[in-house]
A protein has these predicted regions:
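Positively charged
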Residues: 1-127
Length: 127
């Protein structure tokens, strides 16, 4: 297990455009994926992007599951890895809900965020 410290808002890497991944099998990419999963789970998050652990790559992971702050998850989602993600469609209908962010020092700080109700995202997987 390799838990990385979460980069906080204000660090330049959070705002910088991430780099496309050209070789998914590259050992640095595979290590980044493992570190993201370990860090996300350790910090009780349901998603995390590579820049949040100081890596420049266009990679994020998600796993909706019970956490310290999400206790009422009826059906946990599978772990998903997205490499070079690109949203190709989003619904016109939106929904709002409370979200937190691991890159905000106050982990218990949540705010209402409005998002599309559904999206289609094209991405590579970890394999």
């Amino acid at each position: 297990m390799s838990v990385k410290q979460t980069v906080q808002v204000g660090d330049k890497i959070i705002r910088r455009k991430a780099t496309l991944v050209h070789d998914v099998s590259n050992s640095e990419i595979q290590t980044t994926i493992r570190d993201l999963v370990d860090s996300m789970r350790h910090d009780n998050l349901v998603g995390m992007a590579a820049p949040q652990i100081g890596r420049k790559w266009r990679i994020f992971v998600s796993e909706v599951r019970k956490t310290t702050y999400r206790k009422n998850i009826a059906e946990p989602d599978l772990l998903r890895v997205f490499i070079n993600p690109r949203i190709t469609w989003k619904s016109k209908k939106s929904q709002s809900g409370y979200e937190g962010c691991g890159s905000v020092a106050a982990a218990q700080l949540f705010g209402v965020v409005k998002r599309a109700e559904s999206v289609i995202c094209n991405a590579l997987g970890k394999d």
